[in-house]
Structure formats: structure tokens, C-alpha cells
Amino acid sequence: MNEKTDIFSYKSTFDPRLNINLIFKENPNYNNMRDIFDVYGYGFVAPEFKSIFIDGEIFLGEDGFTLDDLKFIEAHEISHILLGHNGPRSEKDELEADLGAYILLKKYNISTERLEDEFEYRHGVPFSEELLTMVEDKM
């Protein structure tokens, strides 16, 4: 990727109607977006633009996130849409979005390792496929 790139966009793997946009610090809107990332995490959905915005800076450097991490973030954000989450951020919605992401990642044969490794830290309970019953009928 060219160092001067300020945004990298592609169609979602999970829903090609949505654009995935990785925003980098060279983008003139990055500082404003950074404030949103600080509130919502690595990414957020902008349904009015049919887009998901992800902080591209987390993928740079030796300790940067991987392609599997990117797909986890993408699947998580798309799960918010599929699950009808549209209110203020809640722990329940975040838990459900991670479970939805697990279902999507498995469906597309993409690693769920990061999701499973981080699940207890993120939600206070260990990951179990039994939890999927919370969202299976909505996905």
C-alpha cells in the first residue's frame, strides 16, 4: 500500500452493497474520525452512506492488525446492521455483534481465532458456541 494513501475502499466480503473504508492519518478528515473511533472502537457503520469506516492506522507497523483482524472488524460491524442495532451503543449489542461476526466468519471460512481469543476480555464471559443461540435466528 502506498504511504501517501489516505483512504482505501473496497466492497464488503459479507455484503457487497456496503463499502468498507480504511481511513489513514493522511486523510484530512482523520482527526474528526479519530474522535468517533475513540468512542466506537476500531470501526463504525454509517448506514446513510452504505459504508463502514475502519481506522486504517491499526494495520500499520510491526504490531499492526492482520487481514483476519480486518475481516473480524468488518463482520462485527455488518452484524450490527443484520441484527437491527440502531440505538446507543450497548454491551448487549456489542456481544451480539461479536456472535454475529463469528457466524459470518465461519460461513466464509475466515479465521475466528482473534474473536475467540478476545471474547472474554471484551465481554467478561468465555466464548462458547452455545451463546450463538442469542443471534442465530436474526442472522
Feature-to-residue mapping (PLM):
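Alpha-helical scaffolds flanking conserved acidic
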Residues: 67-72, 93-96
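Active-site scaffold of zinc-dependent metalloenzymes
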Residues: 23-25, 30-67, 78-84
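Short amphipathic alpha-helical segments that mediate assembly, nucleic-acid/protein binding
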Residues: 16, 29-33, 98, 112, ...
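Long, well-structured alpha-helical subdomains associated
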Residues: 106-139
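Active-site His/Glu-centered metal-binding helix of metallohydrolases
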Residues: 74-83, 96, 100
